[in-house]
Design a protein with these regions (language model features):
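Conserved G1/Walker A P-loop phosphate-binding module
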Residues: 2-159
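Catalytic cores of large soluble enzymes that bind and process phosphate-bearing ligands
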Residues: 29, 55-58, 168, 226, ...
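Short, polar/charged, Gly/Pro-enriched helix-capping and turn/loop motifs at alpha-helix termini
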Residues: 110, 190, 276-280
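Residue-level detector of flexible, active-site-proximal loop/helix-junction positions
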Residues: 112, 163, 255
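C-terminal end of P-loop GTPase domains and the immediately downstream helical coupling element
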Residues: 171, 219-288
Length: 288
């Protein structure tokens, strides 16, 4: 694809225009039953209570933690969708984040790591958005100057590197991967197969296909054949992690490859207004 693609705002506006020109073409996502989720949450909490003294303490604590965290998220706005970018050192995560936002929000540079604390981009500073940021533990955010109405429901977060030598950076990632609605893992051609991201993160969320995106970034540094080989290998690794239905795509901020596909996936997650519930349903299924 030639030239730099539009940011998320411009991409949404183009999609809105195309929808007006083609009113018969509609897209919809299957709904997740919130009432059914609430019943399963209640059942999980009850099972944890009944398991006290009978089951392994770690299992009881884990189930109770999932139930309490899910109930807390249910108490916040589910029209808001939280999307977080996580990734390895030097993978170009912050640069990709800026490209999607359409503004230089996150710091990107030569010194590593460049992201030391989570940074959010929001398109509307409402009480509901601020309450969600507080629950997430986000203390830094940028309000985008330009935006479309649909983006008011998006909270986009740039996380520190998961493989940073700074323990506080890894702690941030560990905290947020348990709470955000859609995870975008940004990996590079050199480290996409590292055991750390697969064993400590992706495999833990084997039931979270619908709310996981894995990006092989910086493919402009590879030949076409090598990029295809790396992407195929990454897809196989992600499937072995238990995420066979997760979106896996190639991207390059320099060439623009994959950025529109990534923006479309984020926009679809926001428009569906089901991503938060889908994430919680996967959490409960894992804990049950």
């Amino acid at each position: 694809m030639a030239g730099k693609p539009a940011g998320l705002v411009e991409r949404l506006m183009m999609k809105d225009l195309l929808a007006r020109l083609n009113p018969m073409r509609t897209e919809s996502a299957p709904l997740v039953d919130g009432a059914a989720l609430d019943r399963r949450l209640a059942g999980l909490a009850q099972a944890a209570d009944l398991g006290d003294g009978r089951l392994a303490p770690a299992s009881v604590t884990g189930a109770r933690t999932v139930a309490e965290r899910a109930q807390a998220r249910r108490g916040l706005s589910e029209q808001l969708t939280v999307v977080a970018f996580a990734g390895s050192t030097g993978a170009g995560k912050s640069t990709l984040f800026n490209s999607i936002v359409g503004d230089e929000v996150a710091k990107a540079g030569v010194l590593r790591p460049t992201t030391s604390e989570p940074l959010a981009a929001i398109w509307q500073e409402t009480p509901e958005t601020l309450a969600l940021l507080e629950w997430l533990g986000v203390t830094r955010w940028h309000v985008a100057a330009d935006g479309a109405a649909a983006l008011a429901d998006l909270v986009l977060i740039d996380l520190p590197d998961h493989d940073s030598t700074q323990s506080s950076h890894r702690a941030h990632v560990d905290h947020f991967v348990e709470r955000v609605d859609l995870m975008v893992w940004v990996l590079d051609p050199q480290k996409y197969a590292d055991a750390l991201v697969h064993e400590q993160y992706l495999r833990r969320f084997a039931r979270h296909d619908d709310v996981t995106v894995v990006v092989l970034n910086q493919v402009d540094r590879l030949t076409v054949a090598d990029a295809e080989a790396c992407l195929s290998h990454l897809r196989r690794l992600v499937a072995e992690d238990g995420l066979s239905d997760a979106v896996v795509l190639a991207a390059s901020n320099r060439s623009g490859e994959g950025l529109e596909a990534l923006a479309d996936r984020i926009l679809a997650a926001v428009a569906s207004r089901r991503t938060a519930v889908a994430r919680l349903a996967a959490d409960v299924a894992t804990a049950a």
